Curated annotation (Swiss-Prot):
This is Phosphopantetheine adenylyltransferase. Gene3D superfamilies: HUPs (3.40.50.620). Reversibly transfers an adenylyl group from ATP to 4'-phosphopantetheine, yielding dephospho-CoA (dPCoA) and pyrophosphate. It is found in: Cytoplasm. Belongs to the bacterial CoaD family. One of its GO terms (molecular function) is ATP binding. It comes from Pseudomonas fluorescens (strain Pf0-1). The keyword Cytoplasm applies. It comes from the Bacteria.
Length: 159
C-alpha cells in the first residue's frame, strides 16, 4: 500500500493545500496530512484547531487522515508507515528550500521518497502567510480558504 505523508504547519490550511490533497488522494492509497506543531513559527492557531480545520476541509475524501505531530518528520513517517513525502512547489523560489529538505529527509529516512507537486494555476499564488495578513486587515479570504477556515480566521481576528 502506498502511503503518502503531506507535512506542513497548515496555519491555516488553504485551497492550495486542499488541491494538493485531492490530487494526492487519487494517486495514493492513503494520504496522511501531518500537521506540525511548529512552536518556533508561533502559529496563529493551536495544533488541535489546525488539525480540526484540516479534517473539516478533507472530510469528503475517504482515504485521507489528519494527524498532528511534534517529533522529527523522518521518525513520524516511520511511525505512520509512509513511503512518500509529498511537498508542494508554488514557485521556483520554493525549490531550493524543498530540495535541501528532501536531501536531509533522504539521509534520515532513506526508504521514504520525496515527491513534489505543483498546485493548480488558480491556487499557485496562495500562501497561509498571505491569507493570515489579508484576514488580519479585514479582507475577503473566501476565494482562498474553505468556509470553516474563513470563519475561524474571522473569529480569531475579532478578538
Amino acid at each position: 500500500m502506498n502511503r503518502v505523508l503531506y507535512p506542513g504547519t497548515f496555519d491555516p490550511i488553504t485551497k492550495g493545500h486542499g488541491d494538493l490533497v485531492e490530487r494526492a488522494s487519487r494517486l495514493f492509497d492513503h494520504v496522511i496530512i501531518a500537521v506540525a506543531a511548529s512552536p518556533k513559527k508561533n502559529p496563529l492557531f493551536p495544533l488541535e484547531q489546525r488539525v480540526e480545520l484540516a479534517r473539516e476541509v478533507t472530510k469528503h475524501l475517504p482515504n485521507v487522515e489528519v494527524v498532528g505531530f511534534s517529533t522529527l518528520l523522518a521518525h513520524f513517517a516511520k511511525e505512520q508507515n509512509a513511503n512518500v513525502f509529498l511537498r508542494g512547489l508554488r514557485a521556483v523560489s520554493d525549490f531550493e528550500y524543498e530540495f535541501q529538505l528532501a536531501n536531509m529527509n533522504r539521509q534520515l529516512a532513506p526508504d521514504v521518497e520525496s515527491l513534489f507537486l505543483t498546485p493548480s494555476e488558480r491556487y499557485s499564488f496562495i500562501s497561509s502567510t498571505l491569507v493570515r495578513e489579508i484576514a488580519a486587515l479585514g479582507g475577503d479570504i473566501s476565494k482562498f480558504v474553505h468556509p470553516a477556515v474563513a470563519d475561524a480566521l474571522t473569529l480569531r481576528f475579532k478578538k
